[in-house]
Swiss-Prot record:
InterPro entries: Peptidase_S1_PA, Peptidase_S1_PA_chymotrypsin, Peptidase_S1A, Trypsin_dom, TRYPSIN_HIS, TRYPSIN_SER. Its main location: secreted. This is Tryptase alpha/beta-1. Belongs to the peptidase S1 family. Tryptase subfamily. The gene is TPSAB1.
Amino acid sequence: MLNLLLLALPVLASRAYAAPAPGQALQRVGIVGGQEAPRSKWPWQVSLRVHGPYWMHFCGGSLIHPQWVLTAAHCVGPDVKDLAALRVQLREQHLYYQDQLLPVSRIIVHPQFYTAQIGADIALLELEEPVNVSSHVHTVTLPPASETFPPGMPCWVTGWGDVDNDERLPPPFPLKQVKVPIMENHICDAKYHLGAYTGDDVRIVRDDMLCAGNTRRDSCQGDSGGPLVCKVNGTWLQAGVVSWGEGCAQPNRPGIYTRVTYYLDWIHHYVPKKP
């Protein structure tokens, strides 16, 4: 089953950046159909940086505890093994303009992760020191296990990824936001089977995944690992982690996110429920 699914999904891509060639650097650092985020919003958003000619943004993440960041496994494993080459930048309106990069002491990738399309696309980063929580930087609330995030619920995804297919976020690289509707898993799975070689009996969208977006609004490359948040009873809850998709805002190809509620026990094995 694993090999069949891998062979059947050759064009489905995770939403992280590869390292840019020299001279392309600042062009390699969006959200489709969105707008610049207000400075007062999304205080849990972080940028993951890898060392090169400069500390380059390659994925997003969210602060879920003063000392812990939640991100996608395909962003940091198994390729990123050198902690010295990884940094975390807390909420920043424009990439690279006021960097205060934080070192990471530990990377924990879910043990069942193989590829984003197979699932378990979730990872934790432990910061060397807890951060000072403020109105500008603070944690996002994880949902209770019972929260389902019903189809049609309006949620928001944020990041610094591409603004369209193969269209990079231009300077000054602002944090972008877009509202996306939740889509029921079985409908999302049926859409991904359209035009695919995968048999109908092979599930593409699995129980640990969550779908959101449409042909006008979606996350895109470079947004990987960032949060999908939904407001429930006045509280922002992190429903998903940007994981993968086929293109960005393409017909019948919603964005696919790691479902946070599916991994709450695993998260809390490492991360205290209260700071």
